[in-house]
Amino acid sequence: MKSEVLSNTIDQFDKILAKSKSLFLAKSRDYGPSWRVLRPSSLTDQLYIKAARIRSLEQKKNQKVEDDITGEYLALINYSLMAIIQEEYGFTEDHLDVSMDKLQHSYEQLVTDTRTLLEAKNHDYGEAWRMMRVSSYTDLILVKLLRIKQMEANEQENLVSEGPKS
């Protein structure tokens, strides 16, 4: 049973990340790597805006702008991966400094690393996260983003924190 649930989790992860990657690549074709000019704090703010909108919609139970909430979650995934890529390459005024092939490779490597971490955490936690409410995920995302904003304010000089990537 446990193996079946984990298999289902990995299948779900793979499907969601395939959608995220498809969206990332499509937007990259449309806009190029224009996001490379974003500073880390700007990416954190973009993530915060997306998570805050999700929370607002969860509380209001209706929306006036009919954007699919799934799209907001996909945006959270892609902005998160972009933020980690920015950490690797640094932001730049010359958004064409790194080829799209390299950026795509970095994206794919991060997805692979995340998948491996998911498998390890599921082993240790026994998929307890499946019992959580979706609204709890939203709250946890917001808490993590507020922590990252504080780390940025501290200029990454943290006493005990592992840093934003964790």
Where are the predicted features?
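Intrinsically disordered, low-complexity regulatory regions
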Residues: 1-166
